[in-house]
Amino acid sequence: SVILDTKGEPVSNAADAYYLVPVSHGEGGLALAKVGNEAEPKAVVLDPHHRPGLTVRFETPLAIAIITESFFLNIKFVPSSSDSEVWDVSKQYPIGLAVKVTDTKSFVGPFRVEKEGEGYKIVYYPDRGQTGLDIGLVHRNDKYYLAATEGEPFVFKIRKATYE
């Protein structure tokens, strides 16, 4: 089914910017954080002090105007001040399979947005196959890192950046 934003409008493919608004996790928004001894912040986090947070765009190479639950997607931060804006998942101590930004985008992205309770969740499909891992939150160093986990998914609503 079609992915809808907070006003019931279909989420657009490769066009608009959206906030991911946590459903069950209090206030906060998406941000980038350093992990390990990285020079630049590349780990995607939910930061309670950063709201409404950074905005994302959903992209599928299909020539279609809207996003549905069945599409494999690239997710990227827009606008971005760096070339590293595309979400991917990589092993990162001590988080596990962390969602991080990279400057390389695969033609068909590894994520899908799927309905979950009152909102949506992101599911990571490493080989674009049938089996996916929910993107949840891993609490480390006072931050909530987005990571592919077996635990509770990060559930959010999708709010278009241009809405008041």
Swiss-Prot record:
The protein's role, per its UniProt record = Inhibits T.cruzi cruzipain.
Q: Please state which protein family the record places this protein in.
A: Belongs to the protease inhibitor I3 (leguminous Kunitz-type inhibitor) family.
Q: Which GO terms describe its molecular function?
A: cysteine-type endopeptidase inhibitor activity
Report which superkingdom the organism of origin falls in.
Eukaryota
Instruction: Just give the chief location class.
Output: secreted
Question: InterPro entries attached here?
Answer: Kunitz_inhibitor_STI-like_sf, Prot_inh_Kunz-lg
* Location(s), subcellular: Secreted
User: Quick one: a GO cellular component term?
Assistant: extracellular region
Protein keywords: Protease inhibitor, Secreted, Thiol protease inhibitor
Q: What is this protein called?
A: Kunitz-type proteinase inhibitor BbCI
Organism, scientific name = Bauhinia bauhinioides
